[in-house]
A protein has these predicted regions:
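N-terminal "arm"/small-domain region of PLP-dependent enzymes with the aminotransferase-like
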Residues: 1-31, 117-127
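Conserved core of the PLP fold type I
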Residues: 29-141
Length: 141
């Protein structure tokens, strides 16, 4: 078994990757990137014809996910997500003291959408669901 979760990889990088790393400016590599990502936000705004304040950029997927939890899940009701899914949903729920309920997948590891048809504080419907690799059609979502 090869573990590929959490950006781990048992294989060395491709030769081109090592060459690219060597060509980087080591002075810039010692600093954190711009936390506002202003250049990226400006380029995205221009490309998509949006105002800069309509674009949110995080410093990684876990950061973006944390901001989503803080923004969208602010009810006393529990949020719902599958019992077999990305391992950080319950972590953020615990950190931010958001009640949650894990909904069991069916015998084919699919989300049972009817389990989510009741009062809740929000739903996380991962699609595709990373651990299972199953992607549902838009009509299911």
């Amino acid at each position: 078994m090869i573990k590929l979760n959490t950006n781990e990889n048992p294989y060395p990088p491709a030769p081109g990757v090592q060459e690219a790393i060597k060509s980087l400016d080591d002075k810039k590599m010692r600093l954190y990137p711009d936390p506002t990502a202003d250049l990226l936000v400006s380029e995205l705004a221009d490309f998509y014809h949006l105002d800069k304040d309509q674009i949110f950029v995080g410093v990684g997927s876990d950061d973006v996910l944390a901001m989503c939890f803080l923004t969208f899940f602010n009810s006393e009701r529990p949020i719902f997500f599958p019992d077999i899914t990305y391992s950080f949903y319950d972590v953020w729920a615990d950190v931010f003291r958001i009640p949650y309920e894990c909904q069991p997948l069916d015998e084919n590891f699919r989300i049972v959408k009817e389990d989510y048809y009741r009062a809740n504080g929000g739903v996380i419907f991962p699609n595709p669901n990373a651990p299972t690799g199953i992607a549902d059609r838009k009509s299911v979502v």
